[in-house]
Amino acid sequence: MQCDLSEKHLLITIILSIFAKEINIDSMVRYPVGIQTFSEIRKRNCLYVDKTQYVYELANDMKYVFLSRPRRFGKSLLTSTFGSYFSGRKDLFSGLSIEKLEKDWTEYPVLHFSLAMAKMGTPEDLFNQINMQLNRMEKQYGLTRDGDDVATRFYNLVNNLYDKTGSQVVVLIDEYD
């Protein structure tokens, strides 16, 4: 007797529902498949290998950090973790190493540039992408556009944010390659 695809799907669904009743689904490990943001991993209670001690050390011992690793090595997740840390999101770090290391949890303005989805064939494409992200950041922080070219706008955004908050500005750049 042969089963067509829909019958196989139904059979698999029935078997899974039987197992789901016997296994506490909530106690199963949730893997963060396709999730690259630290906040989402923590909010969804997904498996997270705690490397926050190194985040703390890099943030407090280095002024500039450049990470160059192969694709799929966790650069975006690490960049997102830095973003949450510098945004003062102590709630996301509950139970992790950094919770014991950090005393102040200062909130800094964070400019997070990501070129992940950008299709750039020309320098003009790159400038357009950066301009779009500058627009988003200016709105996010309630600032008006200050300057015409990318370099001037970026310089003014950093300085205006510093003037507005009195805090150093953190710049994160992801998917630059």
Task: Please state what every model-predicted region is.
Residues 2, 8-177:
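Phosphate-binding site recognition
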